[in-house]
Amino acid sequence: MEEIQKLINELGGSQYKDKDTEHYSEEAVELLIKKIDNKSKGKTVIESNTLIYKTLADWSKVEDNRETIIRSPSNVIEKTFQLFEFLLPNGVETLNTDTTVEQSELFSMVCRLLGNLTYENAPNREFIFDKTPSILKYISSFVSQTKYQSLQRTSCAAIANLSSETDFIQLEFFKLGVVSILIDLICREGTTDEVNQMAIKAFNNLVDNENTQVDIHFKEIHRLLGQLKKSLNKEGYYENSFANDLVSSLSTLSLNKDLQKEILKEGFLNDLIELIEESNVHREMINQFEDDDIEKDKDISIAPSTSELIFKLADNDDYRQYFYNKERDGNDANNILDRMIKIMTSPPPAYKDGDSKAQLKALDVAKVKKNITKTIALCSLEDDVIDKFIKTPKIFVDLLVDTEDTERIVNGEMIIGNLARSEPNCRLLNSYNVIELIADIMKKFPNFQPIQHLGLSSIRNLTLPTINKGFKPSSTLMEDVVFNSKVHNQVIQFAALSLIKNFIGCDQSNLKLFLEFPNALQSLLDLANGRVPASMDDESDQQEQLQLDDAKIQEIEEKFEEKEKTIEKTDEKTDEKTNEKKQSKKDMRVIYEATRLLLRFLDNSELSNHQEKMKQLIEESVEPFFSLLQSPFPILQVEGAKGLVLLIKHDKQLFLSRPSWVKDLVEVLSLSIIPFQQLSREQSTITTDPNHQKLIAQIQSNCNFSTELQNVILSNIFYNFSLDESICKKMKDQNVISELKTLKSKQDAPQSLTNLIQKILVQLTI
């Protein structure tokens, strides 16, 4: 012992150590490691070895020494493994009975060395595992023994460092049963705080791997939650490293997909809500700290992180049912939604005058309310919660009142938009004047896109023509709509167009109002002509808020897309041509919807006295109506054709000045035969599949629209033009006769089409 101490003192001299960096030479390390005696059990030898390992552990606190120690020629890792084998000949099973106090102190220093060598050092972890993987078995056994708590603490620390961000070592410790051992240790009565601190760090690192989580179930989670509550009640949350590490572990585990559903079924949300409900007492424990010692960016209670976890769980469509279903005992007090609403609406606690921590406590509460409000907004997407929420509409309307908090406003708009799913609900919400309230808010935050998008979507739901007959938008609301039609975001543009459509459906006089409103017509024409840049990406960092349940009020384009997916079998050549067009063009939904609105204006005779506006409308609608005509959806093609017919009535020269009009119309007529080919093919298929019948019904609907399209183009355009000698000549110059004959001879061309073509051919050849 004295000899070793003397050697250590000598090695501390300048010959072996850099005094500035505390870096020891390879020679010094080698001299010390050679003194390890792994072939004797004498007390003096054990104590000498303990001193050697303690010294090496101290040296390895310096980063530069770790490489020198672990790769020393005498191989300290191999010597250590041999030492374990020699001192524990009967294996780890008899550790509690066979190990002396002196040996436990030695093992403790060995663990300390291994922990220091692998602290933030992945190559050293790999080196140990490659050379002597069995050494992990001994370290694991030191945790499971109950006789020496100091050894438990240092072995836990070693496991924490060895397993940090190292999958293969995490998995090896898991196979040795360490995950379960650590849970038992953490939850055992009588485990000291010092051991617990290290045990939770080891556990935290081990379960950072889904493969090591497979044996953890709700029972284990519940036990850990119990320990967390004990720790919080004793020490609070701030600067409670055990609680912080345990929260980190529970957060990691609660995001395990296989574990999530199990723990939610067993009532995990109830435990989380309880943590929030009990957090006021933990906030008060911050009073034991001096103001200057408190880091302002740290949470002072567990409630903010808990509420954030609750929000993440609610963000999963499959898990929201656990928020509105009563807990297993059926007790109303355990209804998660009711308790969340109570948290959201509760006034902030009153703090004593002169409480210097009052602001910190209030901010902590505010974080919780923000997360819970976001969670409630997500829950409003579910049909099953609407009847509950609509009973207390004012608490949701109040989210929009007297606030500068943009996130609070977005949540309020989202909830109100989702509540507006039925006529009674809309009437009740409108009794609070929410349309104007939202319109004013949108004007107040013009550049905050989530507020604009969800505001437009909410008002769209509240102004459905079936609910709000006779509705007339205010000047503020019109300004909001016009402003958003210019925003470079397709989602917002489409929402603005949906509102214009609603206004017209509510009252035809709104056509005149829109026409007269400054810049309104121009903004609509710009959208229809594709002059406004658009992106599908929301530029805001609050993308998760753009989740209004638009599926409840389906736009016609969604239906078209579904049909398009269902009807995939088409003529090969036509398919190739259509696909080429689709790939070369941008997303056309906004252009289509804006053009459909232009048709409403052209088709209204009461607007004829607005000559300047109508002239502008006619001149700038030619290309949009051709775009609509060339869309992939028969119903839109019909509207495009009708729009062109109206344009021809106002100014046929605008139409005729388009060089390719004959070719464009014939091409659309050619494509209009496809639904008839599809119908013939599907009707010949014998099947009892009910989905096949739906498919046939969809194709039949397309056939009806195609028939109408053929009639509009052939009767109202081609035939009428064939009666005009000057136009007839231009048509012939564009090879119209040959084109129509080819079209007439197509297979599966319906009789109505061939009859109309024949009528036109007769007129053209007179």
Swiss-Prot record:
Q: Does the keyword Membrane apply?
A: no
Keywords in UniProt for this one?
Answer: Repeat
What if the gene is knocked out?
Not able to initiate development when placed in starvation buffer. Defect in ability of cells to aggregate in response to starvation. They were unable to form aggregation centers and streams, possibly because of a defect in cAMP relay signaling.
Any one GO MF term held by the record is: small GTPase binding
Give the highest taxon in the source lineage.
Answer: Eukaryota
Keyword Repeat recorded: yes
Single GO BP term: aggregation involved in sorocarp development
Under the cellular component aspect of Gene Ontology, which terms does the record hold? cytosol
Region annotation Disordered: residue ranges? 561-585
Start-end of each ARM repeat = 82-119, 167-208, 423-464, 465-537, 610-649
Q: Which SUPFAM superfamilies match?
A: ARM repeat
**Family note:** Belongs to the RAP1GDS1 family.
Q: How does it assemble?
A: Binds to small GTPases racE, racC but not rab21. Binds preferentially to GDP-bound racE.
What is the annotated role of this protein in its UniProt record?
A: Part of a signaling pathway that initiates the aggregation and leads to the formation of aggregation centers or streams. Not essential for cytokinesis, pinocytosis or phagocytosis. Not essential for development, except in starvation-induced aggregation.
Q: Which PANTHER family match?
A: RAP1 GTPASE-GDP DISSOCIATION STIMULATOR 1 (PTHR10957)
Provide the protein name: Darlin
Species: Dictyostelium discoideum (Social amoeba)
Its encoding gene is what? darA
